């Protein structure tokens, strides 16, 4: 995959719904990565992000601690965006569509 360009306000109109959703995920990842590098989250930062931003898709009683412990390379207690993306994929699996979305 190619590199993603950063969007500014005027470009946002051109983005599809999915592109805006991905941009929102990236912004939230960086918003919660306060300790150390912006490219990684500590397990505590990831826990905060998930409990505050995904309370309905991934409630705290769903084995969140185990999922965080099993993500990526936890040797240095830093999780990269790919690990966050993996967790988002797990949360997305719980979403059930009532009916297929039709394209217009």
Curated annotation (Swiss-Prot):
Cytoplasm among the record's keywords?
yes
- Alphabetized GO MF terms: chemokine receptor binding
Q: Name a single GO biological process.
A: apoptotic process
For this protein, the record's SUPFAM superfamilies field holds: EF-hand
Query: Domain EF-hand: where?
Result: 27-61
* Cysteines paired by S-S bonds: none
Localization, per the record, is:
Cytoplasm
What CDD domains is this protein classified in? S-100A13 (cd05022)
InterPro entries recorded for this chain?
EF-hand-dom_pair, S100_Ca-bd_sub
- One GO CC term, this protein: perinuclear region of cytoplasm
Could you list this entry's UniProt keywords, alphabetically sorted.
Apoptosis, Cytoplasm, Repeat
- Asked whether the keyword Transcription regulation is assigned, the reply is no
Protein function: Modulates P53/TP53 protein levels, and thereby plays a role in the regulation of cell survival and apoptosis. Depending on the context, it can promote cell proliferation or apoptosis. Plays a role in the regulation of cell migration by modulating the levels of MMP2, a matrix protease that is under transcriptional control of P53/TP53. Does not bind calcium.
The annotated subunit structure for this chain is: Homodimer. Interacts with AGER.
Q: What is this protein called?
A: Protein S100-A14
Organism per entry: Mus musculus (Mouse)
């Amino acid at each position: 995959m190619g590199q993603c360009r950063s969007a500014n306000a005027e470009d946002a109109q051109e983005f599809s719904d999915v592109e805006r959703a991905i941009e929102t995920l990236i912004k939230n990842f960086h918003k919660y990565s306060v300790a150390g590098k912006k490219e990684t989250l500590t397990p505590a930062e990831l826990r905060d992000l998930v409990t505050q931003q995904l309370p309905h898709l991934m409630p705290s009683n769903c084995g969140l601690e185990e999922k965080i412990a099993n993500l990526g390379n936890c040797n240095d207690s830093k999780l990269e965006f790919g690990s966050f993306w993996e967790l988002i994929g797990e949360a997305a699996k719980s979403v059930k569509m009532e009916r297929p979305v039709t394209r217009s």
